[in-house]
Swiss-Prot record:
This is Uncharacterized protein SAV0385. Residues 175-193, 219-236, 249-274, 300-310 have a biased composition (Basic and acidic residues). It comes from the Bacteria. The keyword Nucleotide-binding does not apply. Signal peptide: none annotated. Residues 172-318 are annotated as: Disordered. Residues 237-248 have a biased composition (Polar residues).
Length: 318
């Protein structure tokens, strides 16, 4: 009897019948087998109908195949009495030995697999440690690179600030030098103007004094005391003019005291010479000739003036 027909007889589904057969075979009980369409199939007997009905009822009560079989075995060994009356269907010692050997092989295989799994876990753990070390090294390198970049940026900023301050100081020093140069040039031009004014004043004073001396000598010959008096008055007028010119030059720059003193001394000498010429015509004529000769030599050979040093000459001590 095949599974489909047997399921109809016991009023169970084919799936339930196959499940019961599976649990029976797992517990070492073997049912009759036959060949159907080239495949092995269970050959159910009439006596199997009652057994399957009891098992189905017990499964409904316990809602579990395992619990149902356990309770049935505790109640009575009905499986061996009803189904397994034939010793041929009972498991033999040879089958038990084979099962033990199979179990031993499975256990050995499991141990080997467990050992391999342990090695793999160790390798994975080691690789994780190496990865952590690499990550730490990368992190430290990144930190060091960041610090070096910050240091470089700080040094660049410091260099830029130093360059800016240096350029500012250089510009200020250049401006100061230019201002000082302009000031020195102005001072030199003023000094040259003052020196020129003093020189012209001295020349005018000498020329006028000499001309006064010459005129005095000539007029003394003609008019005697009257001409001498007029010459003295002219010399006094020239002296006042020279004094006014000296005062004007003092307002623009520092007056050369030596030049003014020389002018006054020359005027005084001219006045004294005019007085002497009034008393003695001969001596006045000789004196006038000598003075005219001296004045011509002085005018032909002007006194060299000391060259004033400019700003850059004084800067480099030239």
């Amino acid at each position: 009897m095949l599974t489909k027909e047997f399921a109809q007889r016991v009023e169970l589904s084919e799936k339930q019948v196959r499940k019961i057969v599976q649990h029976l075979e797992e517990r070492g009980y073997q049912l009759s087998k036959t060949e159907y369409r080239g495949r092995e199939a269970t050959d159910f007997k009439e006596e199997d109908i009652e057994l399957f009905k009891d098992i189905a009822d017990k499964v409904k009560q316990t809602n579990s195949y395992d619990l149902a079989f356990d309770e049935l075995e505790k109640e009575k060994d009905f499986l061996q009495v009803i189904v397994k009356n034939d010793d041929k269907n009972l498991p033999t010692n040879q089958n038990v030995a084979q099962l033990v050997e199979d179990l031993r092989l499975e256990i050995q295989k499991m141990r080997e697999e467990r050992h391999l799994l342990g090695q793999m876990m160790n390798q994975v753990h080691q690789q994780q440690q190496e990865l952590k070390e690499l990550q730490n090294q990368l992190t430290s390198k990144i930190d060091s690179n960041s610090e070096s970049l910050k240091a470089i940026q700080t040094s660049q900023e410091a260099i830029q600030e130093a360059q800016a301050s240096q350029a500012k100081v250089l510009a200020e020093s250049t401006n100061k030098v230019e201002k000082n140069a302009v000031t020195e040039d102005k001072a030199d031009s003023k000094d040259s103007k003052v020196a020129g004014v003093n020189t012209s004043t001295d020349a005018k004073t000498d020329t006028k004094a000499e001309n006064a001396g010459d005129g005095t000598a000539t007029k003394v010959d003609k008019e005697d005391q009257i001409s001498a008096t007029e010459a003295i008055e002219k010399a006094s007028v020239e002296q006042s003019k020279n004094e006014n010119a000296a005062e004007t030059s003092n307002k623009e720059a520092t007056v050369d005291a030596d030049a003014q003193h020389d002018a006054e001394q020359q005027v005084a000498e001219a006045h004294a010479e005019a007085s002497k010429q009034a008393t003695s015509n001969d001596s006045l004529e000789a004196k006038a000739e000598n003075d005219s000769t001296a004045s011509q030599s002085e005018m032909s050979e002007p006194k060299p003036q000391e060259e004033k040093k400019g700003f850059f000459a004084r800067l480099f001590n030239l």
